[in-house]
Amino acid sequence: MTDKHSLRRRGYVLLLLGLLFLLPGCREKPAAKAPGGYDVVDDRGRTIHFDAKPQRVYGNTLSLEEVLLDLLPPERIAAVSPPTLDPEYSLAADKAARVAGRVPAYPGPEPIAALQPDLIFAQLRARPETIATLEEMGFKVFCMEVPTNLDMVRKRLRQMSEAVGEPERGQALLAELDEKVAYVKSRTADIPPEKRRVLLGFSSMGAFGHPDGLFHDICRQSGVINGAARIHMAYGSHLSDEQILQIDPDIMMFVDDGAANDYGGQIRDRVLGDPALQTAKAVKNRRFFFLKDRYRASNTQHMGDAILQIARNVYPDAFTESGTAK
């Protein structure tokens, strides 16, 4: 009997303790988020909170650094890398020179952590172990898809400007980009289908332009037909002479890598001098132009400049006062 009463009393005690635990103020409260600030969501769906605008921002690729250099003053950028300082490859080399910090190209987590950034922009193609290590160390990493078309570039500009707390500046960059795209369209929209020219681009690695890549959309926005997409060129593949003849481009584009490839001259000489390509229309007519490498895959606010460069070279007559392509 005593045991029964004892067990019953213990049960009452445990029940009371449980009720007390549930009452407000009787258990530890989770830490409350600081009032104010703002939240942003990256392309992984992860929410990042900022109590104030980040002051030491780092982007881990040339293209991310180029965006930051037009969004922020140099003192809010933690560091830039050698490619961003090189005018052969960078469209923001002059602004990059005003940033105090330096970091190697494609750094691991240690050099990035040494910068003590309060926001890191990274592309989803970046090494996942680097991103994971930085996040484990407590750094805020905003991950984004690599843009492969104009809409994705627009999205990137909006995301980055919102993350750094400068949405108005982002809107200004978008307006500049859209103005250039609209200008090209106004000059090329009336070119009939039969006068649309087929362009084939060549880098030091050979012909390029697979249909899912950014260059394809740059061509499309320029009113130009991307020759490589005509035969559904796969990413990372190379075109044979037979495939180039099958495309039979109206005009060829040679990437200017600076002094390393004689400013595109080495590619030109190799392609135009290939005996197997002498019947190709562009080779016979010597129709070609050079494009700086920094424009070829410009997935930043400078995409509008790349579109304009290609359109002007392919349809020079459309950009005269009469504005009629021949």
Q: Which residue ranges define each predicted feature?
A:
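Bacterial N-terminal signal peptides that target proteins for export
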Residues: 2-13
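Extracytoplasmic substrate-binding proteins
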Residues: 26, 47, 129-207, 228-229, ...
